[in-house]
């Protein structure tokens, strides 16, 4: 039963819709509380338990996969249909990739002019939308050379989407019934089933009882896979990651690397095909132990991607650094990486005990000491599993965001400045939102799923130990946040003050010497000094990290140190708020007995005082703003650093990043100029639409403050006035039906949610327009 049982408020719980019929005509406060509170109680909300929940989650994956396949197919289809891929690969640096065309009967000459500049540089004759996703670079990297091949890929993706939908539908309808029938000695079917096909299937199966029971064991294994952690881990590690990575290494070796050397695996309309043999000796060197053979004869320095000029024959290398012409990682290095990952993960898939006892490790045996019992606890809490999964995927996404620019994997991606920043921005937002979700569901787990076993001491339960030490955890985070905040902001304000009074020479400038030493350990030279490391200075890696072009290890100074500590401040405050909210979800100094009051994730309901302000939801809500601002500081820093590098004005960042007004003036205001001038009464340009989005997103962002600051009293007065005017206007009074909808003030939770959504959406889209306008 949910801790937020609706009977507290006189409502009935619902299982088939977000808003039950009884509540649909009630106050917004009750409706929102009921939904936000009870939707997290998965079992009672949907009326399913145990393995059926796992099965439903598994089945939802098929739908998710189908959506992904269709989404990718749609993007690729439009590239093939009205993109310029075949033109782009002839000159990837100077040609802008087209995502899709635009046909609008309302476009006049002025409307065409808005997109005209883009079309002229993209090779298109119509109005188009430019692609900032990097998908062209990915297609080029993996060996696509024609629109025909893209169309074939689209068809494959669409077939996979259909297959995923059919698999999900089939399992959803028949799986439970078949399991129940196969597990008994007599035919089983639901009495009164309205599905005649299912009933007839059962009757048919009942006639063949001696045949079908042989399928019991595969079905039981199928169901066990959802609940057996070892089996599930082995499958995900080995089959999904291991074999997929190994297969991708095969594609790179047989298709992508030969294509990068002008040897194409083509599929023509008449059916002719050539399959590139990557090595003259095939697998003989592998079995004979001469693995170094595959790394011999690497591409020459004058190699041109996609041609035979300077091409080598190596297929698996460990060169490091980036190619000189594409400014991207060597495909042979990437193939080696995926081969190693595949082998490693397939081996790791045999670590955990699954079907046979005595073979592999049992996770429950590994989790000893303070971690004992964690496996059972995690298996019984979907919110704990989801929190851990979100945290893990968040870290992976963040790492991808960092690598996508510092070690660009796709050819010529580093030359496309807007795409480079857009991909970093994209992955930063996703990673941040996933981490917020991790903390939110950790709070729900502590409220709803965690129980203290009175028979065990606190030391035997890692979660209990964390809760017991939460005062120390919170106070340490608070101390770090205070230290970072006062010192960082103090230095910024000092520098602003002395600069404003005409004495910039008195600024406090602190060199990040420890970070510079770490850079030198990776091969970076320090102000013309000799290398600290023993790495061969002629290696590709050392050449890459000391290039002026690229962003692997950029020179850093006092402005970088201040930005680093400002970002650290934001990260620590965000974590402080989230940790305090999660750890205090069951009880705090202010209200130690929350858990005994039916206290939930959002709050304990309307009409019980200001308890929403001390709930885990409120901490999540507050931390979201710190997350958004911290992410903004991170991206501001990254973007400005990259802009000055690309424009060869690195001195601007070095001088202006040491005080706050420098950030406002030389980064935000200066780079907003192109959008501010996007359109006027005299005409428009190719940034006009982005300028309009810049304005509209600002308005959305500002609307969020109206909800966040005004709170309940303002809305109560406003709605009363609106309702009064409606009732005093005869025509509107006829339209208005108070029995269908009753306007009431927004609750605190509701107003904060609406305000947060406006703030976040406006914030993110405003900066997206800023990126395109300033970087273009």
UniProtKB/Swiss-Prot annotation:
Per UniProt, which keywords does this protein have? 4Fe-4S, Chlorophyll, Chloroplast, Chromophore, Electron transport, Iron, Iron-sulfur, Magnesium, Membrane, Metal-binding, Oxidoreductase, Photosynthesis, Photosystem I, Plastid, Thylakoid, Transmembrane, Transmembrane helix, Transport
Q: Name one GO biological process term.
A: photosynthesis
Residues that coordinate or bind [4Fe-4S] cluster: 603, 612
GO cellular component terms, semicolon-separated: chloroplast thylakoid membrane; photosystem I
Record EC number: 1.97.1.12
Q: Where in the cell is it found?
A: Plastid, Chloroplast thylakoid membrane
Cysteines joined through disulfide linkages: none
Principal EC category: oxidoreductase
Q: How is the cofactor bound?
A: P700 is a chlorophyll a/chlorophyll a' dimer, A0 is one or more chlorophyll a, A1 is one or both phylloquinones and FX is a shared 4Fe-4S iron-sulfur center.
GO MF annotation list = 4 iron, 4 sulfur cluster binding; chlorophyll binding; metal ion binding; oxidoreductase activity
Sequence intervals crossing the membrane? 57-80, 150-173, 233-257, 334-352, 382-405, 421-447, 472-494, 561-579, 619-640, 687-709, 753-773
What is catalyzed by this enzyme? reduced [plastocyanin] + hnu + oxidized [2Fe-2S]-[ferredoxin] = oxidized [plastocyanin] + reduced [2Fe-2S]-[ferredoxin]
Q: Where does chlorophyll a B3 bind?
A: 706, 714
- Please give the chief subcellular localization of this protein: plastid
Coiled-coil stretches = none
Topology in the lipid bilayer: Multi-pass membrane protein
Domain of life where this protein originates: Eukaryota
Q: Where does phylloquinone bind?
A: 715
Its biological purpose = PsaA and PsaB bind P700, the primary electron donor of photosystem I (PSI), as well as the electron acceptors A0, A1 and FX. PSI is a plastocyanin/cytochrome c6-ferredoxin oxidoreductase, converting photonic excitation into a charge separation, which transfers an electron from the donor P700 chlorophyll pair to the spectroscopically characterized acceptors A0, A1, FX, FA and FB in turn. Oxidized P700 is reduced on the lumenal side of the thylakoid membrane by plastocyanin or cytochrome c6.
Subunit field text: The PsaA/B heterodimer binds the P700 chlorophyll special pair and subsequent electron acceptors. PSI consists of a core antenna complex that captures photons, and an electron transfer chain that converts photonic excitation into a charge separation. The eukaryotic PSI reaction center is composed of at least 11 subunits.
Its family remark reads: Belongs to the PsaA/PsaB family.
Record-given protein name: Photosystem I P700 chlorophyll a apoprotein A2
> From what organism does this protein derive?
Heterocapsa triquetra (Dinoflagellate)
Lineage of the species this protein comes from? Eukaryota, Sar, Alveolata, Dinophyceae, Peridiniales
């Amino acid at each position: 039963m949910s801790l937020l049982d609706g009977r507290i408020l006189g409502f009935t719980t619902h299982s088939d819709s977000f808003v039950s019929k009884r509540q649909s005509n009630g106050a917004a406060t009750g409706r929102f509380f009921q939904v936000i509170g009870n939707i997290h109680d998965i079992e009672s909300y949907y009326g399913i338990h145990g393995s059926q929940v796992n099965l439903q989650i598994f089945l939802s994956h098929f739908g998710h996969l189908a959506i992904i396949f269709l989404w990718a197919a749609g993007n690729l289809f439009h590239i093939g249909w009205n993109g310029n891929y075949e033109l782009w690969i002839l000159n990837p640096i100077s040609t802008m990739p087209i995502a899709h065309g635009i046909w609008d009967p309302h476009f006049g000459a002025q409307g065409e002019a808005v997109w005209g500049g883009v079309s002229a540089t993209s090779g298109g004759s119509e109005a188009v939308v430019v692609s900032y996703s990097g998908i062209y670079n990915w297609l080029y990297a993996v060996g696509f050379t024609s629109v025909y091949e893209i169309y074939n890929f689209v068809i494959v993706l669409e077939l996979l989407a259909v297959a995923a939908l059919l698999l999900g539908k089939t399992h959803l309808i028949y799986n439970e019934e078949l399991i129940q029938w196969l597990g008994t000695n007599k035919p089983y079917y639901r009495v009164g089933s309205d599905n005649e096909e299912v009933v007839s299937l059962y009757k048919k199966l009942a006639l063949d009882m001696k045949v079908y029971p042989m399928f019991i064991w595969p079905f039981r294994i199928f169901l066990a896979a959802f609940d057996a952690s070892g089996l599930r881990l082995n499958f995900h590690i080995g089959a999904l990651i291991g074999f997929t990575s190994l297969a991708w290494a095969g594609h790179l070796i047989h298709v992508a690397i030969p294509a990068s050397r002008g040897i194409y695996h083509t599929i023509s309309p008449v059916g002719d095909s050539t399959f590139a043999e990557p090595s003259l000796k095939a697998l003989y060197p592998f079995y004979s132990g001469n693995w170094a053979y595959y790394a011999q004869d690497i591409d020459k320095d004058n190699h041109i991607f996609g041609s035979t000029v300077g091409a080598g024959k190596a297929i698996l290398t460990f060169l490091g650094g980036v190619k000189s012409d594409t400014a991207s990682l060597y495909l042979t290095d990437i193939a080696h990486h995926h081969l190693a990952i595949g082998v490693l993960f397939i081996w790791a898939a045999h670590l955990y005990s699954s079907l046979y006892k005595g073979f592999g490790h049992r996770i429950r045996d590994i989790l000893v000491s303070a971690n004992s019992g964690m496996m059972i606890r995690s298996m019984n809490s979907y919110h704990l599993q989801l929190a851990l999964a979100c945290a893990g995927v968040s870290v992976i996404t963040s790492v991808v965001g960092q690598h996508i620019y510092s070690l660009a994997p796709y050819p010529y991606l580093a030359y496309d400045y807007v795409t480079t920043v857009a991909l970093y921005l994209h992955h930063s937002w996703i990673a941040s939102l996933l981490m917020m979700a991790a903390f939110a569901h950790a709070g729900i787990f502590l409220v709803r799923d965690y129980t203290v076993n009175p028979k065990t001491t606190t030391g035997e339960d890692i979660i209990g130990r964390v809760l017991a030490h939460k005062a120390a955890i919170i106070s340490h985070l608070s101390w770090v946040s205070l230290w970072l905040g006062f010192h960082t902001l103090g230095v910024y304000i000092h520098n602003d003050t002395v600069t404003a009074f005409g004495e910039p020479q008195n600024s406090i400038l602190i060199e990040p010497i420890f970070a510079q030493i770490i850079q030198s350990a990776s091969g970076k030279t320090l102000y013309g000094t000799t290398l600290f490391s023993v790495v061969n200075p002629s290696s590709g890696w050392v050449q890459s990290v000391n290039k002026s072009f690229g962003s692997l290890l950029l020179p850093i100074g006092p402005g970088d140190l201040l930005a680093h500590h400002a970002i650290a401040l934001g990260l620590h405050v965000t974590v402080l708020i989230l940790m305090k909210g999660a750890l205090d979800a069951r009880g705090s100094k202010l209200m130690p007995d929350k858990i005994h009051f039916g206290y939930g994730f959002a709050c304990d309901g309307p009409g019980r005082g200001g308890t929403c302000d001390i709930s885990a939801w409120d901490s999540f809500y507050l931390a979201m703003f710190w997350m958004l601002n911290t992410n903004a500081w991170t991206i501001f820093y990254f973007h400005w650093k990259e802009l000055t590098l690309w424009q060869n004005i690195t001195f601007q960042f070095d001088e202006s990043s040491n005080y706050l007004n420098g950030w406002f003036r030389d980064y935000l205001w200066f780079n907003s100029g192109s959008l501010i001038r996007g359109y006027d009464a005299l005409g428009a340009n190719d940034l006009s639409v982005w300028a309009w989005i810049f304005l509209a997103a600002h308005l959305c962002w500002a609307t969020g403050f109206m909800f966040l600051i005004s709170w309940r009293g303002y809305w109560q007065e406003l709605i009363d006035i609106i309702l009064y005017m409606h009732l005093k206007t005869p025509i509107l009074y006829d339209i208005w039906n108070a029995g269908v909808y009753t306007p009431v003030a927004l609750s605190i939770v509701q107003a904060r949610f609406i305000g947060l959504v406006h703030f976040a959406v406006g914030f993110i889209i405003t900066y997206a327009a800023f990126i395109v306008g300033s970087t273009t």
